[in-house]
Structure formats: structure tokens, C-alpha cells
């Protein structure tokens, strides 16, 4: 896989995370409370400062009342 494509995916995921939180009408602090993490964790995840693993992604989706498969499909189709 080309580095440019790899880098693009890492930029798309944080955007999707932020979009899902906003769509759910949650602040960073409210989502953090649902996930039992700090708001700094949410901020760093949404800015790409830290990577999110697949289990964290699934938990994030569920906390935002979004189907993880639907969200992952959206991410996979993003360009």
C-alpha cells in the first residue's frame, strides 16, 4: 500500500470519529463520560494525535448510538 493512501486513511478516521460524536449531539466530555475515559483521550483521538484500535472504534460507535458496521463501511468507502 502506498504511503499516501495509508496516511489518508489516518486522516479520515479522526474526522469520522468527530462527525459521529457531533451527530450524536455529544460534547467531548459527554462522550468521555460514556466511554469512561478523559476528554483529552477524545480530543487526541479526534485530532489524530493518538490512534484508535478496532475495539475502541466499536465502543465509540456504540456510545454514539451508531452501528459499528455502518460506520466502518462509511470509512472504508471514504476517499
Language-model features, listed with the residues they occupy:
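Short amphipathic recognition helices of helix-turn-helix/homeodomain-type DNA-binding modules
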Residues: 70-79
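Conserved hydrophobic/aromatic packing and binding residues within compact polymer-binding modules
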Residues: 17, 31-32, 42-45, 71
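Recognition helix of helix-turn-helix/homeodomain-like DNA-binding domains
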Residues: 36-52
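Helix-turn-helix/winged-helix DNA-binding modules
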Residues: 12, 23, 49-52, 63
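Short basic helix-loop element that most often maps to the first helix and adjoining turn
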Residues: 15-34, 59
Amino acid at each position: 500500500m502506498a504511503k499516501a493512501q495509508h496516511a489518508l486513511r489516518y486522516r479520515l478516521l479522526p474526522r469520522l470519529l468527530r462527525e459521529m460524536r457531533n451527530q450524536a449531539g455529544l460534547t467531548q466530555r459527554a462522550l468521555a463520560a460514556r466511554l469512561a475515559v478523559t476528554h483529552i483521550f477524545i480530543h487526541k483521538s479526534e485530532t489524530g494525535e493518538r490512534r484508535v484500535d478496532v475495539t475502541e472504534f466499536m465502543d465509540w460507535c456504540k456510545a454514539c448510538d451508531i452501528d459499528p458496521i455502518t460506520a466502518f463501511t462509511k470509512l472504508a468507502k471514504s476517499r
